Amino acid sequence: MSLDWLTARPIAHRGLHDAQRGIIENTATAFAAAISGSYGIETDLQISADGEAMVHHDDALGRLTEGMGRLGELSAAQIKSVQFKATADRILTLGELLDLVAGRATLLLELKSHFTGDGRLLARVADVLSAYRGPTALMSFDPKLIELARSRYPALIRGIVAQRHYSRSEWKELPASARRNMGLLLHVPRSRPQFIAYSVRDLPAGPPLLMHALWKLPLLTWTVRSDKDRKRAARWADQVIFEDWRP
C-alpha cells in the first residue's frame, strides 16, 4: 500500500497556530489556516470521562484554557464548554474536526496514552473514522496501542512516534526496560507501524534509518522549527512536522 499521500506536504504541528496573531494550537482557526496553506495537519486526541475523543494536547486544562481539571475526569460537554484564554475557539471533538477538514488536508492524529492498556480512545477514534473518507493516519508513543490498532483495526494507517532517549523523570510511568525498547524501536516486530515519526533533534539515528532503508517505512520528523532543523530533516527524513516556522 502506497503512503505517498502521507509525505506529500509538510504537516502543521497542532495546526498552523500563531499565538501572536491569536491563533491557538489545536483550534478550528489553526486547522483552517493549515488548510488554507495547503499543509497537512497533526493534532492530539485525549479521551473524555464519557468516552469521547477530544482534540487537545495536554491531559489537563489550564495552560491555554480557563478552568482546571483532567480531561479524563470531565465529560465531553464539560470540556466543550471551556473557553480558551486567547480566542473564542472551543475544544473540538474528533467528529467536529473531521467535519471541518472534510478531506481537504491529510490528518495525522496522535493518540495520547498513559500506558495503562486503556483502549477506549482507540476504539472511539476507529468508530468516528469509520464513516470518514479523507486521508488520515494514527500515531502514538505507545507501542502497545499501535499493536492493538494493528490487531483490531487493521484498515487504519498507524505509526509510532519515537525519540532516542526517554528520561525517567518525563516517562515515570514506564520501567527502564520499556523506555529502552521504545528508544531502540525493539517493539517494531510486534507493533508493526506503517510509518515512523521521529524527533528531528535525534537524527541521524540508527533504528529509524535502518527501518526506513530495509522496510521502506516512511519517516516523518518533528518538530521542525528552523532552517537548521529543515536541513537536517531534508537529509534524513521524508517529510516534516513543523511549527513556529514555514516550509
Task: Label the predicted regions.
Residues M1-P247:
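Phosphate-group recognition and catalysis centered on beta-loop-alpha active-site segments
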